[in-house]
């Protein structure tokens, strides 16, 4: 089996074989998870009803084929988040920047999610979904404010920057500003995430 895995790994590295990964879309209700999933799948911007039951979609981004799980963000759905996140390669956590009143609630859910860090996915991609146009100076301020509220600055066991998964129990994390409506920013986040997909 080692030889087969090695061979397919070489093909994937050379771009001759498509990688496969499971990712989990999490965040409070109305953060944009289902909208992002459908934008990635077929580039359709449609207003969705709140996700009541877990759904999954298959999509390709670059040379990676993803099976994406959208569990919903309402209080009942949050109870099953931990049942899924140990079985995926990456977690995409969305926050609606416009809804500042819910930052504390989102942080509480994030803290609960990260409490079982030993079984975390390989990486965490945080997307700060801002509906309006992204402009650099404002973007930086929002990013710092978001990290403050979310506790994403130096939070162990997560680390920003390039992380070698083989040498550490630390999981890579990065925050990207995005606007799903304007189709901006999230592509960079998924490119960052793809480097950690085996």
UniProtKB/Swiss-Prot annotation:
Catalysed reaction, written as an equation: GTP + H2O = GDP + phosphate + H(+)
Species lineage: Eukaryota, Viridiplantae, Streptophyta, Embryophyta, Tracheophyta
Entry membrane topology: Peripheral membrane protein
Record's protein name: Small COPII coat GTPase SAR1
InterPro entries: P-loop_NTPase (IPR027417), Small_GTPase_ARF/SAR (IPR006689), Small_GTPase_SAR1 (IPR006687)
Assigned keywords, A-Z: Cytoplasm, Endoplasmic reticulum, ER-Golgi transport, Golgi apparatus, GTP-binding, Hydrolase, Magnesium, Membrane, Metal-binding, Nucleotide-binding, Protein transport, Transport
Pfam families on file: Arf
Binding-site list for GTP: 30, 32-35, 129, 180
Chain span(s) of sequence motif STAR: 2-4
Annotated organism of origin: Nicotiana tabacum (Common tobacco)
């Amino acid at each position: 089996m080692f030889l087969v895995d090695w061979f397919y790994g070489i093909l994937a590295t050379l771009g001759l074989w498509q990688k496969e990964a499971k990712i989990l879309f999490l965040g409070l209700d109305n953060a944009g998870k289902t909208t992002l999933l459908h934008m990635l799948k077929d580039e359709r911007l449609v207003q969705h009803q709140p996700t009541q039951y877990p759904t999954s979609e298959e999509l390709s981004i670059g040379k990676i084929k993803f099976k994406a799980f959208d569990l919903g963000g309402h209080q009942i759905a949050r109870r099953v988040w931990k049942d899924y996140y140990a079985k995926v390669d990456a977690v995409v956590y969305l926050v609606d920047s416009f809804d500042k009143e819910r930052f504390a609630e989102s942080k509480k859910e994030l803290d609960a999610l990260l409490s079982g860090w030993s079984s975390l996915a390989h990486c965490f991609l945080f997307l700060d979904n801002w509906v309006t146009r992204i402009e650099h100076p404002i973007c930086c301020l929002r990013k710092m404010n978001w990290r403050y509220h979310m506790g994403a600055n130096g939070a162990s066991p997560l680390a920003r920057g390039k992380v070698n998964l083989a040498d550490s129990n630390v999981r890579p994390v990065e925050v990207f500003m995005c606007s799903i409506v304007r189709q901006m920013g999230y592509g960079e986040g998924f490119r960052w995430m793809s480097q950690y997909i085996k």
